[in-house]
Amino acid sequence: MASVRINSTSYSAAAWNFFNIMPYGPHTDPTEAQVRWQVNASLVYGAKGLLYFCYFTPGGDEFPKGGAIIGQDGLKTYHYAQAKRINKMLQSYGKVLMDCTSTDIAQIIPGDTPSEKLRQSGIRDIKRDRVDPPHDYLVGTFRHKSGRRAVMLMNNRFAYSAWPTVEFDVRPGQRVVEIDPETGREVPLHDASPLMDGVQLPLLDGGARLFLIG
């Protein structure tokens, strides 16, 4: 995805990603969290379009298990409801991201000092409770057509949720709003754990949240 992002931004070309939502060859049937991870990682890296493989289960010997969004019998599989939930989020975030240009990407892995990796982003620091697992995040930074910065924070683990404490890089006179994944509207930042220091922003396994700063 890094090389795709570099080339798409260099040539001002829209990048699309095409990924599995069914078992295929040596690839196992993805969970909803794994599909969500593929979708959000694509968005963090600046993708402007996404395609599922496959919408309707193909025929032939290569796909004996079936299992696409629509089965060979024409009935909806459980992937249909998964794609519907993910697509709702995509519709909300897409309204903002289609008006954004990717400016930076940071990957925070276990052992990193987040504040050092996030200097070019709209996030100043990410901290964790001492009982939580080490950091594992993707952070995409964008320039919105309004002049504001957009930041997408993603949990890079698809097997565990995350509960980070996030400090944004907010300059005097600016504020942070979140894009509601249900409605696409700008909503005030909400601290999920007011009894803890800082602002806690939980993330689903493979999940992401989108913010505007300005």
What are these regions (language model features)?
Residues I21-G25, F56-G59, R157:
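Solvent-exposed loop/turn segments at secondary-structure junctions
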